[in-house]
Regions:
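Feature captures the catalytic ectodomains and active-site-proximal regions of enzymes
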Residues: 1-261
Length: 261
């Protein structure tokens, strides 16, 4: 399996630049329309496309394991993609699929509609995250604690499910800056009544960093402080048996428009 993300590429001299790794925030409906077209028209390769969430989806291909890992598109904002494309005979099928997808997407009615509305079009797919299915020990068995996850991220959801951690759906949770913070906090407080550990993932500011949007990133951080950290701190102060830890898993720079090492 590989991650199959719809992206927006922009021509630049003799290369194509990764403009938007979300392809203009595709809706799930738009994405499913694209996936159906790819599945119907790429019939000469053993591939199956599975819908995920918006721009982020899965492609399964019958092949030997790849020896090289492919770069995530959100690490390539503003970069020419040529040097990051799959290289070598083992990737011939992937290159073919990407090229075919670009042709199919160029003529797709949804993309034509987005262009008329001056929206970024999903003019390519980006394949990455290749690997074998991993296994994790059950979290509760290993640590003796029950846990649940609140996150719109399919990556976090997948890891949680692999470890036997419950995944809680939240209405209005998008994984971006317009996510419903209030519902996420309310759900976290409810989960604390039945679980030893609740992992609440908030990633709205990350996307804004990768678009170089400093002003909105600051506003989103302020929202996280007032709508997430504040209410949770107040609730936890009423329960002496609960502690809160705030952590980051990586740093994304709105100045460099990429992740910082």
């Amino acid at each position: 399996p590989l991650c199959c993300d719809f992206v927006t590429l922009q021509p630049s001299h003799n290369d194509m630049v990764m403009k938007d790794y979300t392809a203009g925030h595709l809706s799930c409906e738009e994405s499913r329309n694209y996936l159906k077209a790819l599945q119907d028209q790429i019939s000469d390769r053993q591939v199956t496309f599975y819908p995920g969430l918006g721009f982020h989806n899965i492609m399964v291909i019958q092949s030997r394991p790849f020896t090289k890992f492919l770069t995530p598109p959100n690490e390539l904002i503003g970069e020419g993609i040529r040097k990051f494309m799959p290289d070598g005979d083992e990737f011939n099928d992937l290159i073919y699929i990407i090229n075919q997808a670009q042709i199919i997407l160029h003529n797709h009615p949804v993309n034509q509609k987005r262009k008329r509305e001056n929206l970024d079009s999903a003019n390519s797919i980006w394949l990455w995250g290749n690997g074998k299915k991993g296994t994790l020990p059950p979290f509760e068995k290993k640590f003796g604690k029950s846990a649940s996850l609140i996150s719109a991220s399919l990556l976090f959801q997948g890891m949680a499910k692999a470890a036997g951690i419950g995944v809680v759906s939240v209405k209005g949770a998008t994984g971006f800056s317009e996510t419903n913070f209030d519902n996420k906090v309310e759900t976290a407080i409810h989960e604390l009544q039945n679980k030893d550990i609740v992992y609440l993932n908030v990633a709205g500011a990350e996307e804004l960093s990768l678009k170089g949007n400093i002003d909105d990133k600051i506003l989103t951080i302020e929202d996280i402080d007032s709508k997430v950290i504040g209410p949770l701190s107040k609730e936890i102060s009423l329960n002496s048996g609960v502690k809160m830890m705030v952590v980051v898993n990586h740093v994304s720079s709105a100045v460099a428009v990429k992740y910082e090492n």
